[in-house]
């Protein structure tokens, strides 16, 4: 038993723990623009034995229309869209960058596979956990705007079970 504890100690120490949402640190001002950095692929942790490469991540950047950015920002202020659990697996994350007066005010990282969600204001972590409900729906919709409702349901069935 004692050996098992010391064997698991490095994994416990390196694991990221959930952090409750700190609404006092969430940016409250006006937004100028919202950028989306959509990443797809796999990491060393999520690759499979016959994978052509150990790790492959592709990145596509686009600007989200301001109306959609404001709608997403309003959803972020809802206390019911956060789940204070952290997934065991780290996956490729896409980023949503919120700007005001040309400065980055809020950075949000989201994984479609695990619903992992981390939010930063500058370098300060303000939330680490998972998304749920309408936040998950909107994030997936903004990352995959060309998919129909049926395709979204088929591709993200596991994600939609709780919604």
Language-model segments: what does each one mean?
Residues 16-163:
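Function-determining sites in protein domains
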């Amino acid at each position: 038993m004692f050996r098992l504890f010391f064997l698991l100690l490095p994994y416990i120490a390196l694991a990221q723990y959930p952090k409750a949402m700190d609404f006092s640190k969430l940016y409250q001002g006006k937004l100028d623009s919202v950028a989306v950095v959509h990443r797809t692929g796999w990491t060393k942790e999520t690759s499979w034995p016959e994978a052509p490469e150990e790790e492959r991540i592709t990145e596509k950047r686009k600007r989200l229309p301001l109306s959609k950015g404001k709608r997403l920002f309003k959803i972020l202020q809802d206390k019911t869209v956060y789940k204070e659990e952290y997934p065991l697996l780290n996956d490729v994350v896409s980023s949503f960058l919120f700007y005001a007066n040309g400065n980055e005010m809020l950075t949000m990282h989201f994984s479609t596979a695990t619903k992992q969600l981390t939010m930063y204001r500058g370098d300060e972590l303000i939330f680490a956990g998972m998304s749920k409900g309408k936040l998950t729906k909107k994030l997936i919709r903004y990352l995959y705007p060309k998919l129909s409702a049926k395709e979204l349901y088929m591709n993200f069935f596991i994600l939609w079970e709780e919604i």
